[in-house]
Amino acid sequence: PKTWATKNGIAAGSIVYINQGDNGALTLSTDRSERDLRVKLDIREKTGDDLIRDIIGCYVGGYRIIEVTSQHMSPAQKKDLHQIVNKLIGPEILEETINKVVIQDLLSSEELQSEKALRRIRTVVKSMIHDSFASLLNNNGDELAMDVIQRDDDVDRLNLLISRQFTEILRTGSVKQE
């Protein structure tokens, strides 16, 4: 309605969000608040890579709360959920029942700094390359090689965080100045 559009400062080209509630009702909003960044994910029988991809997709998509449900969640599914949450920066499992796991991102978007994360990736990767060569030249370089593998997981976590930050920039249309 025109009065609503005028009241909310909406003009041609403005972004308007449409959200569907649990009861099917649609709500219009000019900003996407934190409460709109919740998703329900029915995983049915998914495990392994398929489940991990779904969770990473929700994370990178900027969802702050991911409610994972299944008729009866298997121990393998719960193990996969715990493993992926441990590989992400910010999310934690806040609730776990026989058929539901609630994952919430506890990292404030104001704390996100892409430039620092990119510098950290650069530093870690440079040291990984150096240590990889050192482990090859060293007769007992297995311990150093295992450390390189661990740091690769850290780089993966930072990469996913940066991907999430870019999604946030696209969603909000703004960049926080550091």
PLM region descriptions:
Residues 3-16, 20-178:
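Cytosolic, long alpha-helical scaffolding segments
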